[in-house]
Amino acid sequence: MRVTLFTAALAATSVSAYPGMKNTFSEIRARVDADGGGADNDDFDSAELIGDLATLDDSKLTPVGKTVKSILLGNDISPESTDVYVTSGKANNLAAKGTPACAADTCCIWKYIANDLQGVFKGKSGRCTDFARAAVRLGFHDAGGWSKFTGDFGGADGSIILAAEEMSRGENNGLQEIVAQTQVWYNQYKQFGIGMADLIQFSANVATVVCPLGPRIRTYVGRKDSSKPCPNDLLPPVTGSADFLIELFENKTIKPHGLTALIGAHTTSQQRFVDPSRAGDPQDSTPGVWDVKFYAETLGSAPARVFKFASDVVLAKDSRISAEFQAFAGSGGQAHWNQDYAREYIRLSLLGVNNINDLTDCSKALPAKTGSFVAPDQAAIDKWLATKDRVAKIADELRNGGNISSLINNVLGWLKGIFGWKY
């Protein structure tokens, strides 16, 4: 089985809608540039146009086309959205599901889908669940099956579910549960005209923002579905060298700084396949939280149970990536990373899409973001992180987004009493 970076890691309105959002995109960019880890369009920043935007004249661009083009070029426009539906009071602008008014609003049904997804993606602890991590991974794997050299197919087209062959590939092992759940959602909502490709990418963005501290990425619908399998061998292996991984992503129009941002999705993960004997071990000390601990702990020391991919370590040390890696780990790194990840994921989610200009912005259907978060059981997690013995119940409860306080105290107390285990 060929285990990939994302297989291993993730298997495991108006501004007034967010009054606490103090920094504008321009302010974030200015601070980042001053720190030397900025978004200047140099050789390490993604700025290549994709799909129909690569050939359309500016005079033919729709508002969506203009916005996406600006984001792809790295211009001064935020890849995050603050647009929302008002769902209560006299200002309510969300029509009832199944009504003509909802059918007339392309994004209306997506708000109801988002509500269903959020209930599955958010755990009792407030952290995101394994289904959320898997949804992000599914989005990566569907879109990632594309390269500039593979012809006019592949990419974000829903084929990872619609083409049965793709799920038989080892690189997609572990996605079976989220694929089955996504099929359930699709069967429930296809009567309203949704597409599988859109559902996969919408789910990934809902999952990202449901994870505490995650960005609220501009989200588009209207992709064309395909049942043609994507090309093989276009997903990144966890054992790849820095040169190999950087070239692989550059062939997807994603430059080293973009790759640096995307691998940060490992911050929520608990690996299962790279080392099955350590199944459930996280890649940083705050699993299920969309923070920058992954960058700091990959670069430096980390608790005993934190599992580092060899490929992440070699990338962190590469001269084309190290400065950006350190910037994400440093002061102001969360806002910097969220913006860079959002921009790069928009690019990834549109690979192989040749009707970008005709898409609809449905960002207003996304859940609200969580701007601050303290895990209610972090003290218990810290105890668990300091140990190495595998206790499946603890790892599984974390994967489900549960609060492990009582569980870990009971389990570790029992181990101490029986074996004299110190913790």
Predicted regions and their residues:
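Catalytic cores of secreted/periplasmic or lumenal enzymes
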Residues: 18-423
